[in-house]
Amino acid sequence: LALCGCTSQPSQKETGMSDSIVKVQDNPVIETIMARRSIRKYKPEAVERDKMETILNCGIHAPNGMNKQSWEVRVVDNQDFINELTEIFKKENPKAAERAGFKNMFNNAPTVAFIAYDPRYDMSQIDCGLLGANMILTAQSMGIGSCCLGGPVRFMKSPAAAGYLKKLDFSDGYELLYAIA
């Protein structure tokens, strides 16, 4: 059994990158992983459909338990949907809407992916996390920033937003887990 510490914070003794990290910087996968950050400022245009399709295809190629693929994804780039839902959010959460630069409840993103899981399968949430990681890293590799969101999902599960959750048309039994803006 080998144990090692792992943190994104450099140790006090560390003054630069280790030799092993420097040696792999020419690896595009590692470069993508190391460059990824949560992005909260977006261009006003929706992600192009062909790029979104690539992101989704890479997501569904994520490892998953017993190949159950116990996830469902809905992508929304319809500004009416986002704006109408945001208006309800603002009525329910007026202080949140007072933030400087607030446009919508998804950090002003014009495209949002909603990921649902199957609570009848105990590994579904893990599978959904792996799906999302693939999607986020694919987007990063294409120069598209993203951010996982939980707050808007909590709101979407509220009675005030129930109609919009229903519009996502997830299969019976599936529950919204998180969103990616």
Positions of predicted regions on the chain:
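Proline- and acidic/polar-enriched loop/turn elements at helix boundaries
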Residues: 71, 151, 176-177
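Active-site-flanking beta-strand signature of metal-NTP-handling nucleotidyl enzymes
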Residues: 112-116, 180
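Beta-hairpin (beta-strand-turn-beta-strand) motif
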Residues: 78, 88, 116-120, 151-152
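Sec-dependent bacterial lipoprotein signal peptides
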Residues: 1-4
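N-terminal amphipathic, basic helical "cap/leader" segment at the start of enzyme domains
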Residues: 6-109
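A glycine-rich helix N-cap at a beta->alpha junction
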Residues: 95-97, 103-105, 163-181
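Small-aliphatic-rich amphipathic alpha-helix that forms the alpha element of a beta-alpha
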Residues: 59, 119-164
